[in-house]
């Protein structure tokens, strides 16, 4: 565990008191400060009280201050990466800038990850400057593709989601830095579309279309400013429970104990499997805490409103990154992945899967692995994950229909698939936590590579059925990201244009309404 930081050491006494690395304490305290700043931002710098210019300046300066406090001079990487990417956008032009920005941003991130891991602090599993750079890389590449779509490609060549997200004018440098480095998302994200962010900063009114009871479309224009207080309070409660769990239970269930020689020699197989599940389940609350707190910060500032449901209840999950209940109750590999790190899955689909001219599945998994980092354990997890995903899909496609007719039988099937999914997920992500090759292979060899072998046997026995609706150029084996076409509209229904003068108001309302219907 890390005991030093490149950022401020002002909170070292607090770090000693709570027995956490000072860089992690800096992260939590800065996020709590960002939460208070978000409330202040929404109250005193509301779009009705000040100009977008002031909101951009304040959001950017606060973000850079938090970055400097947490990471010291390493925070300059955020500005350098953003600045060079913006320069590339300007000098190269809209036809090819998305390619150059993609290669540069991902390459710069990879170089920083290599230097951090193999030169400075291999194995430190704490807050580090490459984490925010991963989010900034997503934003840089997403915006580059969105500008390319909006300013170069023909409207009829775009998919519905690309049409909704397309940016029709070049952002100013201030807008660009504000989008990449604002205080709400500088430390933990999550990714959001540029148009959603600009809509929030400029305080554009929501134009809602709802369906009347008789099925006719009723267009309503509302100047809405719903309160996020309830949503923020609920998410802070989740953060508190997650942090309490992490501080108490997680420390008693280390993942490393799965490869302890004495434990492997003395524990029975049921005990080992049960501990495997418990230890990996206990490793998740820190992600629940970080991502839910980041979501709450954005909501507190007034960002993240996704509209109203059919009952008129506000929804504040536009940029939510996970769904905890669905994760813990997942009965399939796909269901788990669909609800984990949602915004990253959508980014992979937007910039890679739907644009790949060949082998979109392979290209998407490669991009995901490169983006996550350079620890060997990450690649072992992704390779194992591919195998598990294919095997799970083969089983589901070939046998599930035998168990859905009877409620009692389906309940038994769901229980069995839940247990299997949780164990398979835990088995798959052990290298992601252990990081290195040797301990990862120690774990897998102690399990005799049982789930790897079982997955291969499943693929040999059960055929992989082709998706009837699949495009002929896509593989029959599609990753979870390719199946989020409808979900993206659901999550991105605030993505109507604020920068497009040529994109008609009627088209934008239709874009939003189609998302609301789902």
UniProtKB/Swiss-Prot annotation:
* UniProt cross-references to Pfam families, sorted A to Z: MBOAT
Single GO molecular function: 1-acylglycerol-3-phosphate O-acyltransferase activity
What is the superkingdom listed in this entry's lineage? Eukaryota
Pathway per the UniProt entry: Lipid metabolism; phospholipid metabolism
Annotated keywords: Acyltransferase, Endoplasmic reticulum, Lipid biosynthesis, Lipid metabolism, Membrane, Phospholipid biosynthesis, Phospholipid metabolism, Transferase, Transmembrane, Transmembrane helix
GO biological process, alphabetically ordered: lipid modification; phosphatidylcholine acyl-chain remodeling; phosphatidylethanolamine acyl-chain remodeling; phosphatidylserine acyl-chain remodeling; phospholipid biosynthetic process; regulation of chondrocyte differentiation
Q: Does the keyword Transmembrane helix feature in the UniProt annotation?
A: yes
Instruction: Write out the annotated subcellular location.
Output: Endoplasmic reticulum membrane
Its UniProt entry gives the catalysed reaction(s) as: a 1-acyl-sn-glycero-3-phosphocholine + an acyl-CoA = a 1,2-diacyl-sn-glycero-3-phosphocholine + CoA; a 1-acyl-sn-glycero-3-phosphoethanolamine + an acyl-CoA = a 1,2-diacyl-sn-glycero-3-phosphoethanolamine + CoA; a 1-acyl-sn-glycero-3-phosphate + an acyl-CoA = a 1,2-diacyl-sn-glycero-3-phosphate + CoA; (9Z)-hexadecenoyl-CoA + 1-hexadecanoyl-sn-glycero-3-phosphocholine = 1-hexadecanoyl-2-(9Z-hexadecenoyl)-sn-glycero-3-phosphocholine + CoA
Name the membrane topology term: Multi-pass membrane protein
Catalytic residues, chain numbering: 341, 372
Q: What is its EC number?
A: 2.3.1.-, 2.3.1.51, 2.3.1.23, 2.3.1.n7
Bilayer-spanning residue ranges: 21-41, 60-80, 87-107, 183-203, 230-250, 267-283, 365-385, 415-435, 443-463
Q: Which GO terms describe its cellular component?
A: endoplasmic reticulum membrane; membrane
Key word Zinc present: no
InterPro entries from the xrefs?
LPLAT_7/PORCN-like, MBOAT_fam
Q: Which family does it belong to?
A: Belongs to the membrane-bound acyltransferase family.
Q: What does this protein's UniProt record list under function?
A: Acyltransferase which catalyzes the transfer of an acyl group from an acyl-CoA to a lysophospholipid leading to the production of a phospholipid and participates in the reacylation step of the phospholipid remodeling pathway also known as the Lands cycle. May catalyze preferentially the acylation of lysophosphatidylethanolamine (1-acyl-sn-glycero-3-phosphoethanolamine or LPE) and lysophosphatidic acid (LPA) and to a lesser extend lysophosphatidylcholine (LPC) and lysophosphatidylserine (LPS). Prefers oleoyl-CoA as the acyl donor.
UniProt xrefs under PANTHER family: LYSOPHOSPHOLIPID ACYLTRANSFERASE 2, PORCUPINE
Q: What is the protein named?
A: Membrane-bound glycerophospholipid O-acyltransferase 2
